[in-house]
Amino acid sequence: QKEITPISSDDLFIVLNHPNAKFDYPVHYHSDYEINLVMNTYGERIVGDSVEKFDNLDLVMTGPNLPHAWKGEIVEGNHVVTIQFSDKLLNFPILEKRLFSPIKQLLLDSQKGISFSENTMLAMKEKILQLTRMQGFHTVLEFLSILYDLSTADRHILVSNLYDTKDTIRTSKSRRIAKVCDYIEKNFEEPIKLGDVAALVNMSESAF
């Protein structure tokens, strides 16, 4: 299903801090980039057509509209930190500069999903946790530092070459349309509220 992320047009990025996460979110996708740090639990991670086990620590970056989910055990003290930022970042002119080319390649690679080595996860864990405690302009510097460190680290592409993100989105949209049509057909004799139909497909009224 499609997620409407809380990032606004005024945000360069947002940090979502979830101590004792419930891991009850279904497989979903959204138009933003995402860095997800999962700590102190174990379970199964789904990214596109990749399904892998993780244990204690996981760090993954996903690109726009790439379906993903973590099915973790609800272990006391588990912690999830998510950094989300707009897909428009890839079009920033600064990424055309030579020093930013590793970050641009990281963004391109993330469209297939990226996981990182244990050494990278351990190093980035502290930087990402530090970001959750920072405020103001210094958060921007730390965010760019995180992107650069990830861009120069060894990484593993998760999704197979055969996987088609656009096809997955088309299928998802078709299912939503079918669900809406079915609802209207069953309730056409009653007043139909926009909010009820939007909620049926997990969308806000404005997005619907």
Where are these regions (language model features)?
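Non-catalytic, well-ordered alpha-helical scaffold segments
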Residues: 125, 137-145
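A hydrophobic/aromatic-rich effector-binding and dimerization subdomain
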Residues: 1-10, 64-130, 147, 152-157
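Basic, amphipathic alpha-helical hairpins
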Residues: 130-138, 152-155, 172, 179-193
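Generic protein-terminus/edge-of-domain signal
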Residues: 1-59, 65-66
